[in-house]
A protein has these predicted regions:
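Secreted/periplasmic proteins
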Residues: 1-92
Length: 92
């Protein structure tokens, strides 16, 4: 499962864990342990849409979630109103 962050939660414009400025509309993700800069292809199996993101932050810290996508990345593959969606991902 993945969720999204950055719009309406105060994170847009803050410094991410890798030292970059977080852009909620960019194509980034948070992951608990993957090295910063790692590129991942995220695919929503329910609609086939995919997006390539870069790991820039740490999290999510909610049980059952493996990624926390930026709002911009999430809206590429799913409706942000859903809040969460199932995804498949691969390192590229």
């Amino acid at each position: 499962m993945t969720s999204h962050y950055g719009v309406g939660d105060g994170y847009h414009g803050r410094i991410a864990a890798d030292g970059s400025r977080f852009d909620a509309y960019g194509l980034t993700t948070a992951h608990r342990w993957m090295p910063f800069g790692t590129k991942l292809r995220i695919t929503n199996p329910s609609n086939g849409r995919s997006v390539v993101v870069r790991v820039t932050d740490r999290g999510p810290f909610v049980p059952g979630r493996v990624l926390d996508l930026s709002y911009g990345a999430f809206r590429t593959i799913a409706d942000p109103g859903q809040g969460v969606t199932r995804v498949c991902f691969e390192r590229i």
